[in-house]
């Protein structure tokens, strides 16, 4: 039963969302304020329930499409492990719990969470993904908002440079992340009728877009000192990951997307975590030293 629940809520993606929320909260938190474990844990739980509910609802919305795709046909609903109605009730319950927690913690965080769910389960799932080749671009907005939700609980000023940096890293990372998978499973997406880049425009144009967004992504990471406090630690830890991401993309590109996809994919994911965690460590190290 736990396995079905984990698959329905896409637990692996939820973990990324919670980690992003943690980074957002830690970046927005002011060291002069008393740290409250209750608020901290409720923030992570709120993001967990919201993400789980939204992703489960997405499977309810897409189960007929998932049924046509070999990669997704074994998901809980198309495989018959759980009824769509039961999954729908569970997803709504999770969403309500998550929204309630976030609104109680900080109304700004609640509104950002509500907008996130609306965008992901509304326009993206129901229209953009099914009709638009570049749906991954606006679809990356809700995927990047968990970090903003976490930030908002600690600091409701979500339009400052710190919050913007975290959002941009999460946003830009998603395009190469998704399109690498779209290349890998392009036959599945074609079977499901989803017009992804490799299905609709071919490999050459898709690889160009992957490369373009990868360059912008690492460019923003290198520009972090313009957005957040950054010291020698930033330089020491960021540059090797930037180099490795670009190196793996080059190898991936030279194979025309047929080899090295997993190495590039994994380094993208690891680098994203590094790029949002380094500013947190750097800021807290700086504040702690100067506070004492």
Swiss-Prot record:
Q: Which domain of life is it from?
A: Bacteria
Compartments reported by the entry: Cell inner membrane
Statement: the UniProt record of this protein carries the keyword Transmembrane helix: yes
Q: Write out the pathway annotation from the protein's UniProt entry.
A: Porphyrin-containing compound metabolism; heme O biosynthesis; heme O from protoheme: step 1/1
Record-level Gene Ontology MF annotations: protoheme IX farnesyltransferase activity
**Gene Ontology cellular component?**
plasma membrane
Report how it sits in the membrane: Multi-pass membrane protein
Q: What NCBIfam families does the annotation carry?
A: cyoE_ctaB
HAMAP family linked = CyoE_CtaB
Q: What is this protein called?
A: Protoheme IX farnesyltransferase
Species annotation? Bdellovibrio bacteriovorus (strain ATCC 15356 / DSM 50701 / NCIMB 9529 / HD100)
| Origin organism lineage | Bacteria, Pseudomonadati, Bdellovibrionota, Bdellovibrionia, Bdellovibrionales
Question: What gene name does this entry carry?
Answer: ctaB
């Amino acid at each position: 039963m736990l396995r079905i629940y984990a698959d329905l809520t896409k637990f692996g993606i939820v973990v990324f969302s919670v980690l992003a929320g943690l980074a957002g909260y830690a970046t927005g938190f002011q060291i002069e304020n008393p740290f409250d474990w209750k608020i901290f844990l409720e923030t992570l739980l709120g993001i967990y329930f919201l993400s789980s509910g939204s992703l489960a609802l997405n499977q309810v919305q897409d189960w007929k499409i998932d049924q046509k795709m070999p990669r997704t046909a074994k998901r809980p609903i198309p495989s018959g492990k759980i009824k769509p109605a039961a999954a729908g009730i569970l997803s709504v319950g999770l969403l309500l719990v998550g929204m309630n927690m976030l609104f109680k913690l900080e109304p700004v965080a609640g509104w950002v969470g509500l907008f996130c769910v609306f965008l992901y389960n509304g326009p993206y799932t129901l229209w953009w993904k099914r009709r638009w080749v570049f749906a991954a671009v606006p679809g990356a907005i809700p995927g990047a908002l968990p970090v903003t939700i976490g930030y908002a609980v600690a600091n409701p000023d979500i339009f400052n440079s710190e919050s913007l940096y975290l959002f941009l890293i999460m946003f830009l990372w998603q395009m190469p992340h998704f399109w690498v998978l779209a290349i890998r499973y392009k036959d599945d997406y074609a079977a499901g009728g989803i017009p992804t880049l490799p299905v609709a425009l071919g490999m050459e144009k898709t690889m160009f877009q992957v490369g373009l967004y990868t360059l912008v992504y690492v460019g923003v990471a290198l520009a972090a000192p313009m957005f957040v406090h950054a010291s020698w630690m930033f330089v020491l830890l960021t540059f090797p990951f930037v180099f490795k991401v670009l190196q793996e993309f080059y190898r991936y590109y030279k194979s025309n997307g047929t080899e090295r996809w997993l190495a590039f994919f994994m380094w993208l994911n690891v680098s994203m975590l590094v790029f949002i965690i380094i500013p947190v460590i750097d800021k807290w190290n700086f504040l702690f030293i100067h506070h004492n």
